Each structure stands twice: as structure tokens, then as C-alpha cells.
């Protein structure tokens, strides 16, 4: 199979040969959903914190005597039953949100994503993607000429000028093949891959 070559003027040129084992697979929506959710879960820092009845700042004085008032008995105002009291099962920073995805499933999911991008025409090959200086305007003008606004660039080796120029653009990311993750691949509208990076992707996912 072939991936379309995108030129600097935004025109689509001749095709570039690509492995159907990586870019020609059927789309497995359930598997893609699983690896994307697992990636997001593993990125969570676990910084949620709520207080239980021991941690809220309340007096330990008994609100009223045990019997004779006609009201329900109460021991402390920090009770979870009271407004402002502690939580019964509070969220804790020690919670573990990680989800395990084995290598075979991850590679199959990534192949499925790359194949779907190829079918939708959202992935293109470029001869090489560089800028002369680490200037955001140079890269922004280049994307404007190509008719692109939301782009993930996968390069065989990270170019410092390209990386620095892309950092101030909100919808642009530059990564190497090993750094490409399922969430970024499905998030960006267009994925640009250098010719050498195509071979690296095929080697990683074979």
C-alpha cells in the first residue's frame, strides 16, 4: 500500500510505499478505546484529596446530651451525617489509577490507529520537515502555506530548531516514533511522518 506524499505547498504528490501490516489493518474500535483510556489513566497524578471525620477541623464536644432532648443522638459535629463533616470514603492521593496494557495489545492498537488514519487521509509522508531557525513565525507560515492547523509531526530524529519553533504553537507537537502515543494520534487532525520515520514505525510495530 502507499501513503500520500505532502509537499511544502500543500499539494499531494506521489505515493510512498508502506507496509500493509502496519498501515493496512482493520479498525478495532474497542481495542483503540482501551489503550487510549489506559494511557489517560496512567497519566493521572493522583492528587485528589478529601478529608474523613478524623481530619476535618471540628470540636470533639458532644453537640447535646445523649437522652432527653427528643433529637437523634449525636456524638461529634465532624460526623459524615452532618453538613461540613468528613467524607465516609474520601478520595486519597494514594489511589492507583494505572491500567495495564500488554505489549501485544498496545502494538495491535497502534497499528489499528495508523491504519485508520491512512484510510481517512489524515496521515501523510513528508521528505523532511525542518525550519532554518527556531522561530515560531517560520513554522506558522509553513503550516499556513500547507493549509494545516492541528498537526502531529513524527520525525526520525528530533531537529532542535523544529522542536523549539513548535513549542509556542498550541495545536502542534513534534515527536520521534517511539514517543508517539495513541492519544496524540487520534487527537490531531493531521499527522505528518518523515520517510525515515515510516520505516522506524514499521520496525516498532511489526
From Swiss-Prot:
Database matches in Gene3D superfamilies: 3.40.1370.10
Biased composition (Basic residues): 59-70
Bias (Basic and acidic residues) ranges: 49-58
Region feature (Disordered): 43-78
Key words of the record: Ribonucleoprotein, Ribosomal protein, RNA-binding, rRNA-binding
Cellular component GO terms held in the UniProt record: ribonucleoprotein complex; ribosome
One GO MF term: structural constituent of ribosome
GO biological process: translation
Domain of life: Bacteria
Family: Belongs to the universal ribosomal protein uL4 family.
NCBIfam families, alphabetized: rplD_bact
Function: One of the primary rRNA binding proteins, this protein initially binds near the 5'-end of the 23S rRNA. It is important during the early stages of 50S assembly. It makes multiple contacts with different domains of the 23S rRNA in the assembled 50S subunit and ribosome. Forms part of the polypeptide exit tunnel.
Quaternary structure note: Part of the 50S ribosomal subunit.
Family matches, as PANTHER family: 50S RIBOSOMAL PROTEIN L4, LARGE RIBOSOMAL SUBUNIT PROTEIN UL4M
Protein name in UniProt: Large ribosomal subunit protein uL4
